[in-house]
Amino acid sequence: MSTATNENKLRHHAEQQFAEELEELKKSDARQRPANWELSPWAVCTYLLGGELDNGFTVSAKYIGNRRIIETAVATLATDRALLLYGVPGTAKSWVSEHLAAAISGDSTRIIQGTAGTSEEQMRYGWNYAELLSKGPSRAAL
């Protein structure tokens, strides 16, 4: 079985697709950052909502909607609290979570997805079935 090359991907991860914007934000961001964050809360909001930096670089908007929703989400994540995005299908929850993870940690694969019926126990203690099938029972498969 071969691994997918760049040509075979339908879409790159957010941190790859928008690498130039993330790098420009890092360079121009002198604001205080929470521990282990790549960008400040201001820069994370700018990354998602778009805007022009002091150096003239334009950051494209990833989310078109109520600015306050993004600001509240970023403020929540800047504390020690978790963030749960919920709503009807097709309202950009997965898209926003991917871009929040990319801007905050530099790794957009650090998200957990579930449905309204997914319990906390299932998220915390369930198996990663792809990992389980490929490598057998292990800590990585938990």
What are these regions (language model features)?
Residues 2-142:
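AAA+ P-loop NTPase catalytic core and its hallmark functional loops
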